């Protein structure tokens, strides 16, 4: 346990104020959607047939789509099988302070072999994504990201959902993910380009839309480029 001198009173007071404000706004959930996912090294097949060594949620890139309806509680248990600590940050989602996934600020990092359960009621419908906030330039680039969809309370008038997750991959001479995740060149040029572009982890495919069909296209761009 931290000693009194390790605790930042201002930070603790701010966290308590944010948590209290969130609690005042949060209604009783109508139901709970539960998921259990694992972050671990994996191999996925790229569109050219190459087996790419990645880090992934549930052995897929992008990770699983998590879905919850507005008013429901989302509960996600993350188990860490990576060789380094990790967390989940819910990008663009208004969550309680303790659920924000910022290591050393809102939670301690999840150590290799450990688990952590995130639990909150989303306040807004929409398309969001989740990813680590520990060594993000590396862990996201290795493939750790997924989609969170918060559906409206009542169905909207469209025919079907299409989710496109766009990413670029910087590969080394061996055809694997380049381990130089942040270089001076990247910093000087405000980013970098990858050699391979994927949509949902594969080459872009033609989407057929029938006359009169209404599509809800959900775009997520975790690309580091």
What are these regions (language model features)?
Residues 1-51, 73, 77:
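Transition-metal
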Residues 3-29, 143-171:
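Extracytoplasmic/periplasmic copper-protein system
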Residues 45, 97, 172-173, 225:
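Flexible loop/turn segments at secondary-structure boundaries
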């Amino acid at each position: 346990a931290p000693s009194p001198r390790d605790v930042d009173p201002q930070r603790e007071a701010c966290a308590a104020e944010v948590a209290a404000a969130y609690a005042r706004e949060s209604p009783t959930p109508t139901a709970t959607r539960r998921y259990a996912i694992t972050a671990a090294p994996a191999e996925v097949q790229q569109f050219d047939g190459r087996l790419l060594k990645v880090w992934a949620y549930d052995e897929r890139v992008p990770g699983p789509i998590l879905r919850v309806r507005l008013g429901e509680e989302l509960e996600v248990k993350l188990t860490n099988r990576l060789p380094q600590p990790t967390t989940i940050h819910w990008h663009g989602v208004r969550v309680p302070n303790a659920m924000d996934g910022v290591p050393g600020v809102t939670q301690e990092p999840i150590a290799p072999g450990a688990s952590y359960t995130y639990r909150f009621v989303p306040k807004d419908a929409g398309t969001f994504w989740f990813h680590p906030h520990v060594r993000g330039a590396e862990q996201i680039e290795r493939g750790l990201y997924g989609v969170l969809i918060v559906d409206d309370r009542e169905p909207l008038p469209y025919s079907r959902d299409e989710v496109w997750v766009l990413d670029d991959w910087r590969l080394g001479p061996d055809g694997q993910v380049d381990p130089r995740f942040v270089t001076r060149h990247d910093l000087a040029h405000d980013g970098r380009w990858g050699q391979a572009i994927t949509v949902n982890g594969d080459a872009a495919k033609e989407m057929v839309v029938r006359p009169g069909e209404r599509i809800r296209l959900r775009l997520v761009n975790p690309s580091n480029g």
